[in-house]
């Protein structure tokens, strides 16, 4: 077998036996016994084989579906607290993928789709729960911000772009994308201002809810393929969103007041009125756990949209003790992440217990939940991370409460100091 670019001994023009292109239209024409194949067809065959290999491997990985107990155990490794929300999510996600696995309906019973709504304050772990679930199931995951979405035809991001992002995460593999998870954050920000239908156009509120309806419930979305602008003649990819799990999350600030009005809690007047103090703050989480669809309608979500999110899980506000645990206990805890960074420089990093409590206290006062922990730790260690690569002999850095409060810098222990300290203890 050889490659032939000339007319050959016979002087005939040679053609690819597969696509019919002549030797002048291609870079290479490879000759076999009375057969010719061009370089373009060889490349296409390689692509087909690669796609088939890609399709086979995920099926092997996804044969065994983790049970709700296994999903919950995986969430426990990465997320502190939120026990009720973990249980609700584990069951809902398990049922969703069980439905996909057994797609042929038994006795004519077709299983409905159960998308999820997460309600909880900022930094309580909504995004982390969704991300961790996707990672444990080895499925594509993408996030979208509801505040950037607008109706089609207006300046902003179309809801169909969410599916485009999901496809990008799995190299435009439609089958893989249809098993993915989409998390839409700040869903409470697209609520309408009142529970009465508005006569004015609301392109980023109720309008977005209307646009999301079909996508969340299940439709066949037409998405341009990779490099769609370069190859406009290519057909659009058809993605069935009924197989995609949508998780929507939001803080829903003020929702507890709507629930209290419905339940007539604290609505007394004069001597009969309930006065809330500091100790009653924890009851906000308890109030949110009593949320009903009618409360969400009153808040500003349209009934049709709420109907597409039948599974509702509420998350509690994290207290100081939970924040201390978040700093040190999960597999990818912040203290472990920064310890790994320091280890790369050959330095051991130690956070004392009083330092962890001080960091948690600072995050509580900022009202940012777990989300604010990283910025606090980063600011504490900034100068040390700047200096250590240029300083020789440092073996350990210690962070205590005074460092967190800005009263001192982290304690640096040098190689010779460590030896002296050890001999002094004996």
From Swiss-Prot:
- Record bears the keyword Magnesium: no
Q: Name one GO molecular function term.
A: ATP-dependent protein folding chaperone
Pfam name, any one = ClpB_D2-small
Query: ClpX-type ZB domain spans which residues?
Result: 4-57
Q: Name one GO biological process term.
A: proteolysis involved in protein catabolic process
Keywords (A to Z) from UniProt? ATP-binding, Chaperone, Metal-binding, Nucleotide-binding, Zinc
GO-annotated cellular components: HslUV protease complex
* Chain residues that bind Zn(2+): 16, 19, 38, 41
Binding-site residues, ATP: 121-128
- SUPFAM superfamilies listed in its UniProt record: Glucocorticoid receptor-like (DNA-binding domain), P-loop containing nucleoside triphosphate hydrolases
Q: Which family does it belong to?
A: Belongs to the ClpX chaperone family.
Task: State the function annotated in the UniProt record.
Answer: ATP-dependent specificity component of the Clp protease. It directs the protease to specific substrates. Can perform chaperone functions in the absence of ClpP.
Q: Which PANTHER family match?
A: ATP-DEPENDENT CLP PROTEASE ATP-BINDING SUBUNIT CLPX-LIKE, MITOCHONDRIAL, ATP-DEPENDENT CLP PROTEASE ATP-BINDING SUBUNIT CLPX-LIKE, MITOCHONDRIAL-RELATED
- Give the matching NCBIfam families: clpX, PRK05342.1
Q: Quaternary arrangement and interactors, per the entry? A: Component of the ClpX-ClpP complex. Forms a hexameric ring that, in the presence of ATP, binds to fourteen ClpP subunits assembled into a disk-like structure with a central cavity, resembling the structure of eukaryotic proteasomes.
Q: What is this protein called?
A: ATP-dependent Clp protease ATP-binding subunit ClpX
What organism is recorded for this protein?
Shewanella sp. (strain W3-18-1)
